[in-house]
Regions:
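Short, Lys/Arg-rich, polar N-terminal cytosolic tail immediately upstream
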Residues: 1-23
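A structural signal for multi-pass alpha-helical bundles of membrane permease subunits
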Residues: 22, 26-312
Length: 312
């Protein structure tokens, strides 16, 4: 056996060397195929970073980025000392943390349930139903939510009341999170469903023969098969804890629910585009990005500690 392994190693090294030599010889071809992606990344990801200088300047449209006077960390001090800072920050954190706690397990549960459906025809129909909401745009979804929860909407008719749910700050987070779960949970379960399809059938059969009940089969056979996918998805979602989209929150906002619906991204939109305070809004956006990076590194570190060194 050792002889076979020793013979295999040089072959593997030779194969790798051949690949490297081929790439070096045909580097123009690889560069040709990589160029569109590289250009798009540079133009839309890296070049706009020059605009971050606005966060440290008293930006003037006429003078431009290079001609505007430097103010240093003034905008950051102004934002952090603002009486509304903690309210906007907590609104943002509550939405994303509650969404993560309630929304993250749902795709996993859906995938586990889908894995239990034996008839292919029924399984495809169920998949179609749970995948469809993902293709509804955010604005259309918000319109549907407003119609459903209006004082004369279906929900109030069913309950026999005439409550305007969209004006209640206490109901905003539930509406936001529940509608998000309905829209994205089915589509998010695809990766888990694909991973479960590759789970060892022999192991499942052995567990059944050993007398394992349904919960034991899920805990000891199916969940370990998708553990790596769960870890990666959790890290990615936790890393975006401050990057909650402004479109949905803005579309569901009313004057009455602002105490709960005004988040950092809607605040940036209001002071940046509506009030024209570009430097201040850029500083708030940069604050968001820095917190995201810190949280991503921290969550990845925690997951590695809890998962035997496995993370991103």
């Amino acid at each position: 056996m050792k002889t076979v392994q020793n013979q295999a190693k040089p072959v593997s090294k030779q194969t790798w060397r051949n690949k490297v030599t081929y790439v070096k010889k045909n580097w123009q071809l690889y560069l040709f195929f990589l160029m569109p992606g590289l250009l798009l990344t540079i133009i839309f990801k890296y070049l706009p970073m020059g605009g971050l200088l606005i966060a440290f300047e008293d930006y003037n449209v006429i003078k431009g980025v290079l001609g505007s006077p430097w103010v240093g960390l003034e905008y950051f001090r102004r934002f952090l000392s603002s009486p509304d800072f903690m309210n906007y920050l907590m609104n943002t954190l509550k939405l994303i943390i509650y969404g993560l706690l309630w929304g993250f397990p749902v795709p996993i549960i859906l995938a586990l349930l889908m894995n239990r459906i034996q008839k292919t025809g029924i399984k495809k129909k169920v998949q179609l139903l749970i995948y469809m909401p993902n293709f509804i745009s955010v604005i259309v979804l918000c319109g549907m939510v407003r119609m459903l929860l209006s004082p004369v909407g279906p929900l109030n008719r069913l309950l026999g009341i005439s409550t305007n749910w969209m004006t209640m700050p206490s109901a905003f987070r539930t509406i936001y999170i529940a509608s998000g779960i309905w829209q994205t949970a089915g589509w998010a379960s695809i990766m888990y469903t694909a991973a479960l399809s590759n789970a060892s059938k022999e192991l499942e059969e052995a567990a059944v023969m050993d007398g394992a009940n349904l919960l034991q089969q899920i805990w000891y056979v199916e969940l370990p098969a998708i553990k790596n996918i769960i870890v990666i998805q959790f890290i990615l979602q936790a890393g975006n804890i401050m990057s909650i989209g402004f479109e949905k929150a803005y579309a569901l906002q009313t004057d009455m629910n602002l105490p709960a619906s005004e988040i950092l991204s809607t605040y940036v939109y209001r002071i940046g585009l509506l009030n024209g305070d570009y430097g201040y809004s850029t500083a708030v956006g940069l604050f968001n990005s820095v917190v995201n990076v810190i949280l991503l590194i921290f969550v990845n570190w925690v997951v590695k500690k809890l998962n035997d060194g496995e993370g991103l």
